[in-house]
Curated annotation (Swiss-Prot):
This is Uracil-DNA glycosylase. Pfam families: UDG. Its main location: cytoplasm. Excises uracil residues from the DNA which can arise as a result of misincorporation of dUMP residues by DNA polymerase or due to deamination of cytosine. One of its GO terms (cellular component) is cytoplasm. SUPFAM superfamilies: Uracil-DNA glycosylase-like. GO terms for biological process: base-excision repair, AP site formation via deaminated base removal. SMART domains: UDG (SM00986), UreE_C (SM00987). PANTHER family: URACIL-DNA GLYCOSYLASE. The gene is ung.
């Protein structure tokens, strides 16, 4: 299997937290599925970017989690960070709405859709499912990624404190509701998804960007600079 699928590619802090997953039966089944898919179909993101979110934001540096669903399935869009696209790519509708809310909330205008600068500041941009077939949304759902990303969220809940979980949409809320059943020391911000179908039902006006920085400041932590240069 391609080296991009091995835990050795992850920061040591994630290796330590997730080491038990690699020996689980579901993981070997997922790897076999991915090997077949990458061999016979166009899959996003590129293999080397599957774990970009974990590489960009080590476990011990996570301050905020923004949970997405599955990667963008258009050409050149997905690069391993939820909601993000590489520099030079047109903004997908959900990201356009995210930036609209950011401007309304904090007066910040971003043109580039690459959210790497957020990830570098401790914002874990995690999709629930980490791969997808070109042009086929949710095509890799139910193959094991959900269990793996459950493990990521569970480790953060259990072994970190004062992480801010940002849940946009029912899928993110449902995922975390199952995992937040024990007492925890975290903050949760939830609202409808930023997609054009749902944004007007409460995403616009949620003020999550200023709320995140308010909570970080209250914790004595550095606030996120949401401006992308």
């Amino acid at each position: 299997m391609h080296e991009a699928f091995t835990i050795e590619q992850l920061p040591p802090s994630w290796q330590e937290q997730l080491k038990d997953e690699w020996s689980q039966p579901y993981w070997s089944q997922l790897l076999a599925f991915l090997k077949s898919e990458y061999a016979q179909a166009k899959i996003y993101p590129k293999k080397e970017n599957i774990f970009a979110a974990l590489r960009s934001t080590p476990f011990d540096q996570v301050r905020v989690v923004i949970l997405g669903q599955d990667p963008y399935h258009g050409e050149g869009q997905a690069h391993g960070l939820s909601f993000s696209v590489p520099r030079g790519q047109a903004l997908p509708p959900s990201l356009r709405n995210i930036f609209q809310e950011l401007h309304t909330d904090l007066g910040i205008r971003n043109e580039s859709g690459c959210l790497q600068a957020w990830a570098d500041q401790g914002v874990l941009l995690l999709n629930t499912v980490l791969t997808v077939r070109a042009g086929e949304a949710f095509s890799h759902a139910g193959r094991g990624w959900e269990r793996f990303t459950d493990a990521i969220v569970t480790k953060l809940i259990q072994n970190r404190t004062h992480v801010i979980f940002v849940l946009w949409g029912n899928a993110a809320r449902q995922k975390c509701n199952l995992l937040f059943q024990t007492k925890h020391q975290h903050a949760v911000l939830a609202c409808p998804h930023p997609s054009p179908l749902a944004a007007h039902r409460g995403f616009f006006g949620c003020c999550h960007f200023s709320k995140i920085n308010y909570l970080l400041k209250k914790q004595g932590k550095t606030m996120i600079n949401w401006k992308i240069e």
